[in-house]
Amino acid sequence: MRAEVAGLLKQASETLIMPRWRALDDADIATKTSETDLVTIADREAEIFLSPHLEALLAGSFALGEEACSEQGDILNRAEDEWVWTIDPVDGTKNFVKGTRQFCSMVSLAHYGTPVMAWIYRPTEKDCLIATANAGVVLMSDDN
């Protein structure tokens, strides 16, 4: 499952996130809770792509995305379900909007609210940090 999730993050990055990096129009950016709480079309599209693909990897799991939570707060009630994926499609949205390199895509998997695994894909570095509970962290790059 480690490689599959990393592959999904890479695919979302290559097709939905990086084509918009340094190429956003004003219409591609919106605010959520305040003028500094930004969301972009890349955030929304990547989350829409990732959610069903992650759920398909683990039967009965539920994907809880940052953007869906900001629009439908009641889905937070599912955070303690048996298997829950959490998705932040573009962490560091302000940096993404500014065109700087300091942003990433993050996914985690929790079992009854306890984190089990986490993935941080850095599109500008083309690598993925993968953490597993009680087993440490590995770095996968597109080169290996």
Give residue ranges: language-model regions.
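N-terminal subdomain of lithium-sensitive/metallo-dependent phosphomonoesterases centered on the IMPase/IPPase/PAP
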Residues: 1-90
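DPxDG-like acidic metal-binding loop motif
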Residues: 75-138
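Short, intrinsically disordered, charge-balanced linker/junction segments flanking boundaries
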Residues: 141-144
